[in-house]
Amino acid sequence: MNTAVLLFSTPMDFARKGVVADISQFLVAHKGSVLHSDDHLDSGRNLLLSRLEWDLDGFDIPTAEFEKYFKPLAERFQIHYHLALTQH
């Protein structure tokens, strides 16, 4: 199975505004199936830290173009992120 892992951080205020839900909806809208999601609130640094992994089977965004599609969402929520590809 080929999967993608999105590691991201964003100011904690955006956690209350649905950033995780919006990212999950973005993935599902592009036929991604979320396999794992882990979140951590770092109140000392005022950050939401998150890891989302999804199955790439059927995902309709080529991984090389992910940044182009994800950029508007990243800018809206001030997201810093890293995308990694894995094989299980």
Placement of each model-derived feature along the sequence:
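A conserved regulatory-domain signal marking ACT and ACT-like small-molecule sensing domains
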Residues: 1-88
